[in-house]
Amino acid sequence: MAISGQATLADALARYEQDFTRTDVYFGYENVIVARKGTLVVGCILSFKGTDEDRYAALDSQGGEFPRESDDDEIYIDSLAVDPDHRGGGIAKQLVRAVIEQAAAQGFTKVSLLADVAKPHLGKLYRSLGFVEVKRMRYLNDEYEKLVFDMVQANTSQGYAI
């Protein structure tokens, strides 16, 4: 709830539901890919262009200063979630790959994210997809590793370039 600026979970959910239809917030529908099994939502991933982060940061209802998470030349993965009953089936990897493909289609060569070092399984997941750590940083009192998937580097190591 801290990031939403709302006092209760109900208020936070109402705020996110209202803002989901907007195009001037990073968690709007345009930045979300949803994984479904039939009609059931089993996962989702939220990403945005690094060039858009400052525009979104201006909407912070808490008025606090946050360090930039992204760089202008990349697509940034902000959030990834898979329903607990559907974990272990490759949904998270499919969603991350979808963002990488989308980034390439838009002319980007890098995709980045922050992984909480207190949750090593996250770093392991992203490393298995070719992400590498480029730095560590503190964000909201926690330590994160910034991981980057560089398409040119990944493809060159396989013998071809984009």
Residues of each region from the PLM?
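C-terminal "cap" of GNAT-fold acetyltransferases
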Residues: 64, 109-123, 127-129, 135-162
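Conserved GNAT-fold acetyl-CoA-binding loop/helix
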Residues: 1-20, 30-31
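Conserved G/P- and acidic residue-centered "switch" motifs that form tight phosphate/ATP-binding loops
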Residues: 90
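A short helix-loop-beta-strand connector motif used in the catalytic cores of GNAT acetyltransferases and
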Residues: 21-34, 50-55, 76
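Conserved beta-strand in the GNAT
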Residues: 34, 40-49, 76, 81
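Conserved GNAT acetyl-CoA-binding A-motif
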Residues: 75, 87, 96, 103-115
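Conserved acyl-donor/pantetheine-binding loop and adjacent beta-alpha core of acyl/acetyltransferases
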Residues: 48-79
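A short, internal acetyl-CoA/4′-phosphopantetheine-binding micro-motif in the GNAT/acyltransferase core
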Residues: 64-65, 80-87, 116
